[in-house]
From Swiss-Prot:
GO terms for cellular component: ribonucleoprotein complex; ribosome. The gene is rpmH. NCBIfam families: rpmH_bact. This is Large ribosomal subunit protein bL34. Keywords: Ribonucleoprotein, Ribosomal protein. PANTHER family: LARGE RIBOSOMAL SUBUNIT PROTEIN BL34M, MITOCHONDRIAL RIBOSOMAL PROTEIN 34 FAMILY MEMBER. Belongs to the bacterial ribosomal protein bL34 family. One of its GO terms (biological process) is translation. One of its GO terms (molecular function) is structural constituent of ribosome. It holds the Pfam family Ribosomal_L34. It comes from the Bacteria. It comes from Rhodopseudomonas palustris (strain BisA53). The keyword Ribonucleoprotein applies.
Length: 44
């Protein structure tokens, strides 16, 4: 069986990137929550 994590910078950016987060209401909530917590990095 192959490993489930096959790293790809492009897919990572598209799925978990800042622009992807801003594109949906849920993603915006994620960013707001991470800002409220004082996270150094908001997204991938």
């Amino acid at each position: 069986m192959k490993r489930t994590y096959q790293p790809s910078k492009l897919v990572r950016k598209r799925r978990h990137g800042f622009r992807a987060r801003l594109a949906t209401v849920g993603g915006r909530k994620v960013l707001a929550a991470r800002r409220a917590r004082g996270r150094k990095r908001l997204s991938a």
